[in-house]
Every structure is written in structure tokens, then in C-alpha cells.
């Protein structure tokens, strides 16, 4: 049988030394939401709890300011 290699999860924000996650940085925030617009959980992304809270807050703020969509484009 074939063995599957799982990539080790790590927190990108800790590795880069980020102090605060900016809600205006839409390119970074898009990596942490699904196609349907949901916030991806930390058990999938490997983000530490401190940064997951900041990430959720930043995504919600950018949604409120219409920088990110609440849902996908359903017609």
C-alpha cells in the first residue's frame, strides 16, 4: 500500500513574525476563507489560536467594509 505524506502544519504568522493581522490585506485574508466564503478552521490551516482570533476579526471587519464577500457569487 502507498503511504501518504502529510505536510506538517505550521503557523505562517508566527514564522513571519507578524504582530497584528491587517483587515485591509485582502490577498492574505483570501487564503483563509473557502470558496463559499466561510472562515477556514485552524485545525486545517495550522494557525495558532492567537492569530486565528485576529484572522477571524480581520475577515469580519473586511466583510463589513465590503472588501471581502460574505458568500460566493450565486446567481
Curated annotation (Swiss-Prot):
Domain of life of the native organism: Bacteria
Record keywords: Ribonucleoprotein, Ribosomal protein, RNA-binding, rRNA-binding
Family the entry assigns: Belongs to the bacterial ribosomal protein bS18 family.
Transmembrane segments: none
GO annotation, cellular component aspect: cytosolic small ribosomal subunit
Name of the featured protein: Small ribosomal subunit protein bS18
Keyword hit for Cell inner membrane: no
Subunit structure: Part of the 30S ribosomal subunit. Forms a tight heterodimer with protein bS6.
NCBIfam families membership: S18
Role according to the record: Binds as a heterodimer with protein bS6 to the central domain of the 16S rRNA, where it helps stabilize the platform of the 30S subunit.
SUPFAM superfamilies linked to this entry: Ribosomal protein S18
GO molecular function, one term: structural constituent of ribosome
GO terms under biological process: translation
Lineage of producing organism: Bacteria, Pseudomonadati, Pseudomonadota, Gammaproteobacteria, Vibrionales
Amino acid at each position: 500500500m502507498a503511504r501518504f505524506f502529510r505536510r506538517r502544519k505550521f503557523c505562517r504568522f508566527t514564522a513571519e513574525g507578524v504582530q497584528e493581522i491587517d483587515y485591509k490585506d485582502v490577498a492574505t485574508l483570501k487564503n483563509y476563507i473557502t470558496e463559499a466564503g466561510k472562515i477556514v478552521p485552524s485545525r486545517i490551516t495550522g494557525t495558532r489560536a492567537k492569530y486565528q482570533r485576529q484572522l477571524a476579526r480581520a475577515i469580519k471587519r473586511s466583510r463589513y467594509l465590503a472588501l471581502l464577500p460574505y458568500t460566493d457569487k450565486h446567481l
